[in-house]
């Protein structure tokens, strides 16, 4: 049985294989200053109103946490209680690093669509691709607990 493999081809294949390993992005492997995706705590946030949205940034900014789902019976509302003039919207906008976020809407935003928007905007800005669409949303917490199988923890922010 003849083989077409010679020393030169073998070294070429070996070098190509070694090079492929070195192009794996650092954020995938983890290490000092990086948390590998497999090591992150996946969290669902139940409650996307005034308190829930402003509290969410504690989780979003933690490198060892990944918010993967939000839940609120309201889909998208603008009738939440305001603590001070434009305080909730401006807190969310500052957390996102987008001062113009929903500026001029005149009302306090909230609901699961707003929660999902906040999570995806925050992670999009941090993603190498510039996009992130990995946050599920649920109207009922029972559906979340039944269907979201990749959740390690749940944070409940409801009245």
Question: Language-model segments: what does each one mean?
Answer:
Residues 2-159:
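N-terminal glycine-/serine-/threonine-rich beta1-alpha1-beta2 phosphate-ribose binding loop
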